[in-house]
Design a protein with these regions (language model features):
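Signature of the chorismate-utilizing enzyme
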Residues: 1-136
Length: 136
């Protein structure tokens, strides 16, 4: 993977059209594994995750670790959508909490609100929604 870093002026320029800009630092991991790094970073922080990429049941080249999530979006048995903040912040970039009462529409609304810069030399996930969707 090529080394990708943005200058301050590039970050400011990207911020005019995107709400999320990945800040990248490449570190040598030595004997660390994705799980050992996750355990050190997550340390009982709610909403943390370790997502391993895999192709055809075989480990692939990326491990994604998320810590200090913004919040949790759920839909109860009656169909009402609920946002539970982990950071005392709204789910939307404009600061509002007016989410659609349709679960999938609320997910789309949050995703659209937090546009992410796509960088060719980075893994396909630099930020975004991570979770589980179930239905009956």
């Amino acid at each position: 993977m090529a080394k990708v870093q943005f200058s301050k002026s590039e970050v400011l320029e990207l911020a005019t059209t995107h709400r999320v800009i990945p800040l990248i630092e490449t570190l040598f991991s030595g004997i660390e594994t994705p799980m050992s790094i996750f355990e050190k970073l997550a340390a009982d922080k709610p909403g943390s995750f370790l997502l391993e990429s895999a192709q055809h049941g075989v480990w692939a080249r990326y491990s994604f670790i998320g810590v200090n999530n913004r919040g949790l979006l759920t839909q109860d048995a009656t169909g009402n959508v609920h946002w539970t903040s982990s950071t005392h912040q709204s789910p939307l970039a404009d600061g509002s909490t007016n989410l659609s009462n349709s679960g999938l529409d609320a997910v789309a609304q949050i995703q659209k609100s937090w546009t992410t810069v796509s960088v060719a030399d980075l893994p396909p996930l630099t930020s975004g929604l991570v979770g589980v969707m179930g239905w009956d």
